[in-house]
Amino acid sequence: SPITTTVVVTPTFENGGNSNSGPTDTFIITVNPTAQIDPIENIVVCDEDIINPIVFTTENTGGVTIYSWTNDNTSISLASSGNGTIQGFTAINSSNTTQIATITVIPTFESGGVSNTGPSETFTITVNPTAQVDSLVDQVLCNGESTDAIEFTTTNTDGTTVFNWTNDNTTI
């Protein structure tokens, strides 16, 4: 919060060995704190998950802290910039790779008609792609024949995809 001090000025006039004091005057000096933002946790979600509003906070009191932010990857369905809280949104990843957006937040503290900008805080929003399996070819066999090897693959290029499968006819 701002720190203030009151300065009292008392004028004294001297001439010929005589002096007299005049009326005092006062003024206030206010020193605002450096704008600051509390750390923000990184976020990891999957395609089409809802991200709750991201509310920025500060330890500063006695004034107003305004936050401006930028986003370097709008493909996740978040605007390239804004002010204040990042409103909740549905994260989108329409690719087959993880999408990472770096969000940079800059705080500005205002009090007494004076503002100052503090150091930025950066966090990431990671949106993983939807799990996907490449198309499989149906197999037609005669009784007693073995199937060709069935390999499950994906076009997702990072992370790990685990394939679980079931068979609705266990007599085969």
What annotation goes with each model-predicted range?
Residues 1-172:
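Extracellular low-complexity Ser/Thr/Asn/Gly-rich intrinsically disordered segments
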